[in-house]
Design a protein with these regions (language model features):
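The feature marks the mature, well-folded catalytic cores of soluble enzymes
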Residues: 1-131
Length: 131
């Protein structure tokens, strides 16, 4: 799995441009620009409920390979209208993924070279779904 420094591009949710996140978005974009890091706004991410793109977007495992985990967090199970339009985003971007049935928020994964650190929330999610 690639570390954050090895990924191709940073995508930022459009919802970050709205108050109360706008100053954070400005600081982030300025920092990326100053470091010559390629970035773009993520299509279909205007909702303030879709700002955590790292949670629902695929994980990049090598230059051309992405794994999409099942984004079905416990805190959104009763609010399907808050789930992001990930399939539409990926289609628009032309990203092909390997789908996984594992229920994992991408934000709960940290890549450390050839190792991955994950939170134990994956076990709670599996039990909650009866898997």
């Amino acid at each position: 799995m690639l570390t954050n420094f090895e990924t191709n591009k940073v995508f930022i949710a459009k919802g970050l441009s709205f108050v109360p996140y706008s100053s954070t978005a400005y600081s982030l974009v300025t920092s990326l620009y100053n470091r010559n890091v390629a970035w773009s706004e993520l299509p279909y991410s205007e909702s303030p409920f879709h700002i955590w793109a790292r949670d629902y977007m695929p994980v990049q495992v090598n230059k051309d390979k992405f794994v999409r985990f099942n984004y079905n967090p416990d805190y959104l199970r009763n609010y399907p209208e808050y789930k992001p339009y990930t399939s539409m985003m990926l289609s628009y971007l032309g990203v092909k993924v390997i789908n996984s049935d594992l229920v994992v928020d991408g934000g709960n994964i940290i890549s450390c070279g050839d190792k991955v650190i994950m939170t134990d929330k994956i076990f709670l999610e599996i039990v909650a779904l009866g898997i």
